[in-house]
Amino acid sequence: MNRNDVTEKIITVKVSKGIQWADVAKKVGLSKEWTTAACLGQMTLDDKQAKVIGKIFGLTAEEQKWLQVVPYKGSLPTPVPTDPLIYRWYEVVSVYGTTIKELIHEEFGDGIMSAIDFSMDIQRQADPKGDRVNVVLSGKFLPYKTY
């Protein structure tokens, strides 16, 4: 057994029971974005969170322990994503990455946006031309230090 096995079990139970990530997040007490990432194997849960997830998805004590192991982050199976939705994100970064970098540096100086001290919010935005996906990424700015 490993973390990937637990992730697969979570996904299988989610599909078979029609569970929604927002409902899981509500029970865990965290955002749907973070909770989903955790259930998909990208975040580490504490004991209390793992027990809640375990109850929802029928996980054994051993499987709950795997939820508490620091995961190998980055879940894409190929360097260039092949899933169409994930590829669009790759495309956004390919097209707008230098613009994002330039504007962040202009506003904040030399540094990076943290993906550790970070939050994300995904919402549906009604639009007469077709609903839109509204994604807000918020990361702490971390300036490079001189030494």
Curated annotation (Swiss-Prot):
UniProt entry keywords in alphabetical sequence: Lyase
Catalysed reactions, as listed in the record: cyanate + hydrogencarbonate + 3 H(+) = NH4(+) + 2 CO2
SUPFAM superfamilies reported for this sequence: Cyanase C-terminal domain, lambda repressor-like DNA-binding domains
InterPro entries: Cyanase (IPR008076), Cyanate_lyase_C (IPR003712), Cyanate_lyase_C_sf (IPR036581), CYNS_N (IPR048564), Lambda_DNA-bd_dom_sf (IPR010982)
Entry similarity comment: Belongs to the cyanase family.
Entries under NCBIfam families matching the protein: cynS, PRK02866.1
Name the UniProt record assigns to this protein: Cyanate hydratase
Gene: cynS
